[in-house]
Amino acid sequence: MAIANKNIIFVAGLGGIGLDTSREIVKSGPKNLVILDRIENPTAIAELKAINPKVTVTFYPYDVTVPVAETTKLLKTIFAKLKTVDLLINGAGILDDHQIERTIAVNFTGTVNTTTAIMEFWDKRKGGPGGVIANICSVTGFNAIYQVPVYSASKAAALSFTNSLARLAPITGVTAYSINPGITRTPLVHKFNSWLDVEPRVGELLLEHPTQTTLECAQNFVKAIEANQNGAIWQLDLGRLISVEWTKHWDSHI
Protein backbone atom coordinates (compact mmCIF):
# COMPACT_ATOMS: atom_id res chain seq x y z
CA MET A 1 0.00 0.00 0.00
CA ALA A 2 1.30 3.42 -0.89
CA ILE A 3 1.81 5.50 2.25
CA ALA A 4 1.05 8.76 0.43
CA ASN A 5 -2.20 10.40 1.58
CA LYS A 6 -3.00 7.62 4.05
CA ASN A 7 -4.06 8.01 7.69
CA ILE A 8 -1.80 6.01 10.00
CA ILE A 9 -1.92 5.33 13.74
CA PHE A 10 1.43 4.32 15.22
CA VAL A 11 1.45 2.94 18.76
CA ALA A 12 4.89 3.56 20.30
CA GLY A 13 6.03 5.61 17.34
CA LEU A 14 8.58 7.53 19.40
CA GLY A 15 10.73 4.62 20.58
CA GLY A 16 14.05 3.41 19.17
CA ILE A 17 12.86 1.61 16.05
CA GLY A 18 9.58 3.51 16.25
CA LEU A 19 11.01 7.00 15.90
CA ASP A 20 13.19 6.16 12.91
CA THR A 21 10.21 4.43 11.31
CA SER A 22 8.06 7.50 11.95
CA ARG A 23 10.73 9.58 10.22
CA GLU A 24 10.69 7.29 7.19
CA ILE A 25 6.89 7.26 7.12
CA VAL A 26 6.52 11.05 7.06
CA LYS A 27 9.04 11.22 4.21
CA SER A 28 6.59 9.08 2.22
CA GLY A 29 3.84 11.66 2.61
CA PRO A 30 0.89 10.26 4.54
CA LYS A 31 -2.02 12.59 5.13
CA ASN A 32 -1.97 12.02 8.89
CA LEU A 33 0.42 10.28 11.27
CA VAL A 34 -1.12 9.84 14.71
CA ILE A 35 1.38 8.74 17.33
CA LEU A 36 0.20 7.08 20.52
CA ASP A 37 2.91 6.73 23.13
CA ARG A 38 3.26 6.52 26.88
CA ILE A 39 5.83 9.31 27.12
CA GLU A 40 5.43 12.59 25.30
CA ASN A 41 8.42 13.86 23.31
CA PRO A 42 7.65 17.33 21.93
CA THR A 43 11.10 17.60 20.34
CA ALA A 44 10.57 14.43 18.32
CA ILE A 45 7.08 15.51 17.26
CA ALA A 46 8.44 18.88 16.12
CA GLU A 47 11.17 17.11 14.16
CA LEU A 48 8.64 14.87 12.40
CA LYS A 49 6.55 17.89 11.45
CA ALA A 50 9.64 19.64 10.07
CA ILE A 51 10.66 16.66 7.92
CA ASN A 52 7.49 17.02 5.87
CA PRO A 53 5.30 20.02 6.75
CA LYS A 54 2.53 18.69 4.48
CA VAL A 55 1.93 15.79 6.87
CA THR A 56 -0.27 16.37 9.91
CA VAL A 57 1.49 14.77 12.88
CA THR A 58 -0.46 14.52 16.13
CA PHE A 59 0.28 12.93 19.49
CA TYR A 60 -1.95 11.35 22.11
CA PRO A 61 -0.67 9.89 25.39
CA TYR A 62 -1.44 6.18 25.51
CA ASP A 63 -0.51 3.23 27.69
CA VAL A 64 -1.29 -0.08 25.97
CA THR A 65 -2.04 -1.72 29.32
CA VAL A 66 -5.29 0.24 29.81
CA PRO A 67 -8.63 -1.59 29.44
CA VAL A 68 -10.09 -2.05 25.96
CA ALA A 69 -12.88 0.41 26.79
CA GLU A 70 -10.36 3.22 27.33
CA THR A 71 -8.61 2.45 24.06
CA THR A 72 -11.94 2.42 22.24
CA LYS A 73 -12.75 5.84 23.68
CA LEU A 74 -9.43 7.25 22.44
CA LEU A 75 -9.88 5.71 19.01
CA LYS A 76 -13.38 7.19 18.81
CA THR A 77 -11.81 10.64 19.20
CA ILE A 78 -9.24 9.90 16.51
CA PHE A 79 -11.75 8.44 14.04
CA ALA A 80 -14.09 11.39 14.59
CA LYS A 81 -11.25 13.71 13.60
CA LEU A 82 -9.80 11.72 10.68
CA LYS A 83 -12.99 9.98 9.46
CA THR A 84 -10.92 7.04 8.19
CA VAL A 85 -7.77 5.24 9.32
CA ASP A 86 -5.88 3.04 6.86
CA LEU A 87 -3.13 1.46 8.95
CA LEU A 88 -2.57 0.63 12.62
CA ILE A 89 0.98 -0.13 13.73
CA ASN A 90 1.24 -1.86 17.11
CA GLY A 91 4.79 -1.20 18.26
CA ALA A 92 4.84 -1.16 22.05
CA GLY A 93 7.42 -3.42 23.65
CA ILE A 94 9.66 -3.83 26.68
CA LEU A 95 12.61 -6.14 27.29
CA ASP A 96 12.98 -6.85 31.00
CA ASP A 97 12.37 -10.37 32.25
CA HIS A 98 12.32 -9.11 35.84
CA GLN A 99 8.96 -7.51 35.00
CA ILE A 100 7.03 -10.63 34.09
CA GLU A 101 3.46 -9.33 34.25
CA ARG A 102 4.28 -6.04 32.54
CA THR A 103 6.24 -7.76 29.77
CA ILE A 104 3.20 -9.86 28.90
CA ALA A 105 0.84 -6.90 29.33
CA VAL A 106 2.81 -4.63 27.00
CA ASN A 107 4.19 -7.06 24.44
CA PHE A 108 1.15 -9.27 24.00
CA THR A 109 -2.01 -8.18 25.82
CA GLY A 110 -1.56 -4.57 24.72
CA THR A 111 -1.36 -5.61 21.08
CA VAL A 112 -4.47 -7.77 21.45
CA ASN A 113 -6.43 -5.05 23.24
CA THR A 114 -5.54 -2.25 20.82
CA THR A 115 -6.43 -4.52 17.91
CA THR A 116 -9.71 -5.52 19.56
CA ALA A 117 -10.59 -1.87 20.11
CA ILE A 118 -10.00 -0.81 16.51
CA MET A 119 -12.20 -3.65 15.26
CA GLU A 120 -15.13 -1.63 16.60
CA PHE A 121 -14.46 0.83 13.76
CA TRP A 122 -13.05 -1.46 11.05
CA ASP A 123 -14.90 -4.80 11.22
CA LYS A 124 -16.94 -5.20 8.04
CA ARG A 125 -19.55 -7.22 9.97
CA LYS A 126 -20.36 -3.96 11.76
CA GLY A 127 -20.39 -1.97 8.55
CA GLY A 128 -16.74 -0.98 8.85
CA PRO A 129 -14.44 -0.40 5.88
CA GLY A 130 -11.71 -2.82 6.96
CA GLY A 131 -8.12 -1.82 7.53
CA VAL A 132 -4.53 -3.00 7.83
CA ILE A 133 -2.59 -3.94 10.97
CA ALA A 134 1.20 -4.18 11.22
CA ASN A 135 2.29 -5.77 14.49
CA ILE A 136 5.89 -5.39 15.58
CA CYS A 137 6.88 -8.78 16.94
CA SER A 138 10.44 -10.17 16.98
CA VAL A 139 12.70 -12.86 15.58
CA THR A 140 12.58 -14.26 19.12
CA GLY A 141 9.07 -15.36 18.18
CA PHE A 142 10.75 -17.80 15.76
CA ASN A 143 13.50 -19.00 18.09
CA ALA A 144 13.73 -17.78 21.65
CA ILE A 145 16.63 -16.01 23.29
CA TYR A 146 16.38 -18.57 26.06
CA GLN A 147 17.87 -16.28 28.71
CA VAL A 148 14.80 -14.02 28.31
CA PRO A 149 12.04 -16.62 27.99
CA VAL A 150 9.24 -14.30 29.10
CA TYR A 151 10.08 -11.70 26.45
CA SER A 152 10.55 -14.38 23.80
CA ALA A 153 7.25 -16.07 24.67
CA SER A 154 5.37 -12.76 24.62
CA LYS A 155 6.66 -12.07 21.11
CA ALA A 156 5.82 -15.59 19.95
CA ALA A 157 2.29 -15.02 21.24
CA ALA A 158 2.04 -11.71 19.36
CA LEU A 159 3.23 -13.43 16.19
CA SER A 160 0.67 -16.22 16.55
CA PHE A 161 -2.07 -13.64 17.15
CA THR A 162 -1.04 -11.76 14.02
CA ASN A 163 -1.07 -14.92 11.92
CA SER A 164 -4.61 -15.59 13.12
CA LEU A 165 -5.71 -12.04 12.29
CA ALA A 166 -4.54 -12.57 8.73
CA ARG A 167 -6.57 -15.78 8.43
CA LEU A 168 -9.63 -13.92 9.74
CA ALA A 169 -9.41 -11.21 7.08
CA PRO A 170 -12.18 -12.70 4.88
CA ILE A 171 -14.53 -12.41 7.88
CA THR A 172 -13.45 -9.05 9.34
CA GLY A 173 -12.08 -7.21 6.32
CA VAL A 174 -8.95 -6.43 8.35
CA THR A 175 -5.63 -7.70 7.03
CA ALA A 176 -2.48 -8.13 9.10
CA TYR A 177 1.21 -8.94 8.90
CA SER A 178 4.08 -9.11 11.37
CA ILE A 179 7.29 -7.12 11.53
CA ASN A 180 10.04 -9.17 13.19
CA PRO A 181 13.26 -7.22 13.80
CA GLY A 182 16.50 -8.98 14.54
CA ILE A 183 18.93 -7.58 17.09
CA THR A 184 18.83 -3.83 16.58
CA ARG A 185 21.04 -1.29 18.31
CA THR A 186 18.53 0.48 20.56
CA PRO A 187 18.60 1.38 24.27
CA LEU A 188 16.38 -1.68 24.74
CA VAL A 189 19.21 -4.13 24.09
CA HIS A 190 22.18 -2.38 25.65
CA LYS A 191 21.23 -3.38 29.17
CA PHE A 192 18.34 -5.57 30.20
CA ASN A 193 17.48 -8.19 32.77
CA SER A 194 17.41 -11.92 32.11
CA TRP A 195 14.86 -14.15 33.79
CA LEU A 196 15.92 -14.95 37.36
CA ASP A 197 19.30 -13.39 36.45
CA VAL A 198 20.36 -16.56 34.64
CA GLU A 199 22.70 -14.48 32.46
CA PRO A 200 23.48 -10.95 33.73
CA ARG A 201 25.52 -10.20 30.58
CA VAL A 202 22.90 -11.23 28.02
CA GLY A 203 22.68 -7.74 26.50
CA GLU A 204 26.45 -7.46 26.14
CA LEU A 205 26.68 -10.94 24.64
CA LEU A 206 24.07 -10.16 21.99
CA LEU A 207 25.90 -7.00 20.94
CA GLU A 208 29.09 -8.99 20.36
CA HIS A 209 27.39 -10.38 17.26
CA PRO A 210 26.34 -8.57 14.04
CA THR A 211 23.44 -6.17 14.54
CA GLN A 212 21.53 -3.61 12.52
CA THR A 213 20.81 0.08 13.03
CA THR A 214 17.36 1.45 13.77
CA LEU A 215 17.49 3.28 10.44
CA GLU A 216 18.15 0.07 8.51
CA CYS A 217 15.24 -1.55 10.30
CA ALA A 218 12.97 1.46 9.68
CA GLN A 219 13.72 1.59 5.97
CA ASN A 220 12.80 -2.07 5.59
CA PHE A 221 9.71 -1.53 7.72
CA VAL A 222 8.47 1.03 5.19
CA LYS A 223 9.13 -1.46 2.38
CA ALA A 224 6.99 -4.02 4.22
CA ILE A 225 4.20 -1.46 4.62
CA GLU A 226 4.32 -0.74 0.90
CA ALA A 227 4.27 -4.47 0.07
CA ASN A 228 1.08 -4.81 2.17
CA GLN A 229 0.92 -8.62 2.07
CA ASN A 230 -1.76 -10.11 4.28
CA GLY A 231 -0.27 -12.84 6.46
CA ALA A 232 3.32 -11.94 5.65
CA ILE A 233 5.90 -12.74 8.30
CA TRP A 234 8.64 -10.21 7.69
CA GLN A 235 12.11 -10.70 9.15
CA LEU A 236 14.03 -7.42 9.36
CA ASP A 237 17.57 -8.45 10.16
CA LEU A 238 21.06 -7.16 9.38
CA GLY A 239 19.66 -4.58 6.99
CA ARG A 240 17.66 -7.12 4.99
CA LEU A 241 13.92 -7.64 4.50
CA ILE A 242 13.09 -11.34 4.28
CA SER A 243 9.70 -13.00 3.82
CA VAL A 244 9.60 -16.00 6.16
CA GLU A 245 7.76 -19.13 5.10
CA TRP A 246 6.07 -20.55 8.17
CA THR A 247 6.30 -24.31 8.57
CA LYS A 248 2.97 -25.92 9.41
CA HIS A 249 3.32 -28.83 11.84
CA TRP A 250 -0.35 -29.17 12.73
CA ASP A 251 -3.71 -28.13 11.30
CA SER A 252 -7.06 -27.82 13.08
CA HIS A 253 -8.86 -28.61 9.79
CA ILE A 254 -11.59 -26.06 10.54
UniProtKB/Swiss-Prot annotation:
Pfam families: adh_short (PF00106). One of its GO terms (biological process) is alcohol catabolic process. Its EC number is 1.1.1.1. It is an enzyme of class 1 (oxidoreductase). GO terms for molecular function: alcohol dehydrogenase (NAD+) activity. It comes from Drosophila virilis (Fruit fly). One of its GO terms (cellular component) is cytoplasm. Homodimer. Disulfide bonds: none annotated. The keyword NAD applies. This is Alcohol dehydrogenase. NAD(+) binds at residues 10-39, 63, 155. Substrate binds at residue 138. It catalyses: a primary alcohol + NAD(+) = an aldehyde + NADH + H(+); a secondary alcohol + NAD(+) = a ketone + NADH + H(+). CDD domains: ADH_SDR_c_like. Belongs to the short-chain dehydrogenases/reductases (SDR) family. Keywords: NAD, Oxidoreductase. The active site is at residue 151.
